[in-house]
């Protein structure tokens, strides 16, 4: 029973929709036919009735002329003016019309720049600021060299040039820059003593170079060696054979230093309580100085030591 009721309801709905669709189709068809009739009347020759209808339609379609004239006048009033401007003057004309400040700046005289005062530095920066540097002036090297070279070396140079030895002046070391006067009082005794040692070593090195320029074969002999030979008793000379005479090349070099005492080497100076005299380079280079451990160079001529002469 339910199935038969549902089928009957569906069939009635389908029939209703079919009738509504057919009704819509008929109305659409009628409307289409009416439009075709209207168009066919326009294509056909106009009759009196059709001419009156067409004139009425034209009058309704055309706008009235007065409002059109008013609109044209309003358009002419709102149109901007047209300028014929040269391309070179375009910028100036635009600036004049727009009233830009760039044009006013060009025409107006230039204003002087305003210098703002610099902000003052704080007192803390002034307190932390270091003192200004002291300008250090180096002393001329000529004065320093004259002070370091002893006076006796000038006389020796004159005597040796007469004999025929040409000595080249030794190149001095570069002097240290002096300390600024501000820190002169703060110098420690250790630094002053080190400076004294440095100056003494420099003087000894310069004298050693000057003495070594005489003859590279013969060593230096101290005057104390000659004094011991002169003061020795004749019995000692008779008991021991006399030493061999040195070659003639060393005779010239030995006679010259007798007038000037040889400077003591650094570290070889004798103490006041020591019974021994000053040590000379000939003692260091003698063959009997085996305890010192210095080797004898083959180019030097060996000389007897005072110990050998005394025994």
From Swiss-Prot:
**Known tissue expression:** Highly expressed in roots and at lower levels in rosette leaves, cauline leaves, stems, flowers and siliques.
Low complexity: compositionally biased ranges = 1-27, 290-302
Q: Where in the cell is it found?
A: Nucleus
Task: List the ranges annotated as motif VQ.
Answer: 90-99
**What are the annotated GO cellular component locations?**
nucleus
Bias (Pro residues): 240-249
Q: Summarize what gene deletion causes.
A: No visible phenotype under normal growth conditions, but mutant plants show enhanced resistance to salt stress.
Q: Where is the segment annotated Disordered? A: 1-78, 103-125, 228-266, 290-311
Query: Where are the bilayer-spanning segments?
Result: none
One record GO biological process: intracellular sodium ion homeostasis
- Please give the superkingdom of this protein's source: Eukaryota
Query: Where this protein primarily resides, as one coarse class?
Result: nucleus
Q: What induces it?
A: By salt stress.
Q: Which Pfam families match?
A: VQ
Keyword terms, alphabetized: Nucleus, Stress response
Cross-referenced PANTHER family, in alphabetical order? Answer: PROTEIN HAIKU1 (PTHR33783), VQ MOTIF-CONTAINING PROTEIN 9 (PTHR33783:SF4)
Quaternary structure? Interacts (via N-terminus) with WRKY8.
- What role does it play? Functions as a negative regulator of salt stress response. Functions as a repressor of WRKY8 transcription factor by decreasing the DNA-binding activity of WRKY8 and acts antagonistically with WRKY8 to regulate sodium and potassium homeostasis under salt stress.
What is the protein named? VQ motif-containing protein 9
Q: Which organism is it from?
A: Arabidopsis thaliana (Mouse-ear cress)
């Amino acid at each position: 029973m339910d199935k038969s009721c549902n089928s009957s309801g569906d069939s009635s709905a389908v029939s209703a929709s079919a009738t509504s669709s057919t009704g819509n189709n008929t109305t659409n068809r009628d409307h289409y036919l009416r439009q075709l009739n209207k168009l066919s009347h326009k294509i056909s020759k106009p009759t009196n009735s059709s001419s009156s209808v067409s004139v009425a339609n034209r009058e309704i379609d055309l706008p009235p002329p007065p409002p059109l004239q008013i609109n044209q006048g309003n358009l002419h009033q709102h149109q901007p003016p047209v300028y014929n401007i040269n391309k070179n003057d375009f910028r100036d004309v635009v600036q004049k019309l727009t009233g830009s400040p760039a044009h006013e700046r060009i025409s107006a005289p230039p204003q002087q720049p305003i210098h703002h005062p610099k902000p003052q530095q704080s007192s803390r920066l002034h307190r932390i600021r270091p003192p200004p540097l002291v300008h250090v002036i180096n002393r001329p090297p000529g004065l320093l060299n004259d002070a370091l070279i002893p006076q006796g070396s000038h006389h020796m140079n004159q005597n040796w040039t007469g004999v025929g030895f040409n000595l080249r002046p030794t190149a001095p070391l570069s002097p240290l820059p002096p300390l600024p006067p501000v820190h002169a009082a703060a110098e420690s005794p250790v630094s002053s003593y080190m400076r004294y040692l440095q100056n003494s070593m420099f003087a000894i090195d310069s004298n050693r170079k000057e003495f070594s320029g005489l003859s590279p074969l013969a060593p230096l002999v101290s005057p104390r060696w000659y004094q011991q030979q002169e003061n020795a008793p004749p019995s000692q000379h008779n008991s021991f054979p006399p030493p061999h005479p040195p070659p003639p090349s060393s005779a010239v070099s030995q006679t010259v230093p007798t007038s000037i005492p040889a400077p003591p080497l650094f570290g070889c100076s004798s103490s006041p309580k020591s019974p021994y005299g000053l040590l000379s380079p000939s003692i260091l280079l003698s063959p009997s100085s085996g305890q010192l451990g210095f080797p004898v160079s083959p180019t030097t001529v060996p000389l007897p030591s005072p110990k050998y002469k005394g025994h």
